[in-house]
């Protein structure tokens, strides 16, 4: 018995010695860790201050022990999360050992105050747990919900498009709590009513799946049998924007994808709405129809409003600070803009782009293309910016096919130069023919109060003052974007009536 105990003790000591030698750990750079999840989500929506704990496992799939040189939270001491790695609490850990084909637990805890300002407790609280092993850096994402909100369609929808259907009835988003769109929301066989004062925040980011590949995860998409009706008021507008409200992100473009009015969707309307901080504002696809009234579209990393072979009516709308065309019309369709201000400063893209075709292959060759007649009417509107030409036209027939490119500007302020001479002088008589009566303004003309700071109200000496024509048909438009009564005889051009 004594011999057995001595042998057992000796074997145990030998094992300890072997297992604790540094050379026992693999240093192969191809030896990586595995994790039981790539994203750890905390599913609790707090109504008061509270904490939640979730866990995942770090797996060593290798046939030799491995040493994780560093485990830490990316935000460091500022992180809202705390960790417990293999029984040890903290925010940073060094030289964590995992035996061959073994695993250890990582517990993550978060404390949320849903009543804190959004700048402190955003809708989606995100963090990364970083792992450094043999020169490799790996990560596990942590996500928690920082506000008492309606997370829609689901708090687990990142990278997973979901269809909202109400069997051809309607849904009212009238909860006083904000709505957070997390993922891609398809609206089908349903009318979604969005009443005055509703706040909608869209959580964007890069996502990837087999159906769409890599794309921006954060979109509202209205399918053919779906409709969206936004019913804001001057006092209580509906605001649709990204969910990052920290100071550095408050006016940052490209945070989420945008709103798509899909092919053949009818009866969509936005009244007193603001759509901002997206890749594009609103995209109306083939044969869709859309009405915009008293709506602002701005801070986009491409175009503010896109119409492709669609029907759009816009009254008293302000579209600005867009990296692409502020308004981009392609492949024809029917468009009417009344009392709109379309402004483009600091970018090479024109404020307005109009064409009656669409290329389905390389834009330079455009061998495969769709052609459809364009009817576009602009009345009492400003199309202006910092470039020489803020209007860009594309008539696939070069003016040879009557009725294919029908454009008309009445009582408008525009800015054109090269447009009047290019395309074999096709538009040399644009001012006076298609644009009549019009003012072709220059940068020397007084127009806005302060375009450099996105104040598009009219200057006291603005050339737009009193130059519009009252619009009585097909509907009376007698107030401006801010609810100011327009002059009954000589209203001002653009979305703002100057207030004396």
Kindly give the residue locations of the regions a language model identified:
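Asparagine-centered strand-capping/turn motif at beta-strand->loop junctions
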Residues: 58-62
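Sec-dependent N-terminal signal peptides
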Residues: 4-13
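C-terminal motif of bacterial Sec signal peptides marking the signal peptidase cleavage site
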Residues: 15-18
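Short acidic/proline- and small/hydrophobic-mixed sequence motifs that coincide with surface turns
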Residues: 51-52, 63-68
């Amino acid at each position: 018995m004594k011999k057995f105990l001595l042998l057992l003790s000796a074997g145990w000591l030998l094992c300890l010695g072997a297992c604790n030698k540094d050379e026992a750990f693999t240093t192969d750079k191809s030896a990586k860790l595995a994790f039981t999840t790539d994203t750890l989500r905390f599913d609790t929506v707090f109504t008061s201050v509270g904490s939640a704990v979730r866990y995942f496992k770090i797996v060593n799939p290798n046939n030799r022990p491995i040493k994780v040189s560093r485990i830490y939270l990316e935000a460091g001491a500022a992180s809202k999360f705390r960790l417990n790695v293999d029984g040890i609490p903290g925010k940073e850990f060094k030289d964590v050992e995992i035996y061959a084909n073994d695993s250890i637990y990582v517990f993550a805890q978060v404390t949320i105050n849903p009543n804190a300002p959004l700048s402190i407790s955003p809708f989606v609280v995100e963090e990364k747990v970083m792992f450094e092993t043999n020169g490799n850096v790996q990560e596990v994402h942590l996500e928690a919900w920082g506000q008492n909100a309606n997370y829609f369609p689901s708090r687990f929808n990142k990278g997973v498009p979901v269809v909202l259907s109400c069997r051809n009835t309607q849904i009212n988003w009238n909860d006083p709590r904000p709505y957070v769109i997390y993922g891609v929301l398809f609206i089908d066989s349903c009318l979604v009513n969005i009443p005055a004062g509703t706040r909608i925040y869209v959580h964007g980011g890069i996502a990837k799946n087999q159906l769409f590949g890599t794309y921006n995860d954060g979109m509202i998409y209205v399918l053919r049998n779906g409709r969206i009706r936004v019913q804001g008021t001057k006092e209580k507008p509906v605001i649709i924007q990204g969910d990052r409200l920290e100071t550095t992100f408050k006016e940052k473009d490209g945070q989420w994808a945008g709103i798509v009015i899909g092919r053949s969707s009818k009866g969509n309307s936005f009244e007193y709405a603001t759509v901002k901080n997206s890749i594009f504002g609103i995209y109306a696809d083939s044969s869709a129809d859309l009405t915009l009234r008293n709506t602002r579209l701005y801070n986009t990393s491409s175009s503010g409003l896109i119409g492709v072979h669609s029907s759009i009516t816009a009254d008293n709308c302000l579209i600005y600070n867009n990296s692409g065309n502020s308004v981009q019309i392609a492949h024809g369709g029917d468009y009417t803009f009344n009392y709109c201000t379309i402004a483009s400063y600091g970018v090479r893209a024109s404020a307005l782009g109009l064409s009656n075709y669409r290329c389905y292959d390389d834009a330079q060759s455009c061998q495969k293309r769709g052609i459809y007649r364009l009817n576009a009417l602009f009345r009492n509107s400003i199309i202006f910016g910092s470039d020489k030409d803020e209007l860009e036209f594309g008539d696939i027939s070069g003016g040879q096919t009557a009725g294919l490119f029908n454009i008309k500007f009445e009582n408008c302020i525009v800015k054109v130069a090269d447009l009047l001479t290019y395309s074999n002088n096709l538009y040399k008589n644009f001012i006076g023919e298609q644009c009549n009566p019009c003012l072709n303004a220059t940068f020397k003309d007084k127009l806005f109060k302060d375009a450099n700071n996105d104040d598009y109200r009219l200057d006291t000496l603005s050339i737009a003052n009193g130059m519009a024509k009252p619009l009585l048909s097909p509907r009376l438009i007698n107030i401006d974007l801010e609810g100011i009564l327009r002059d009954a005889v000589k209203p001002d051009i653009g979305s703002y009536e100057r207030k004396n």
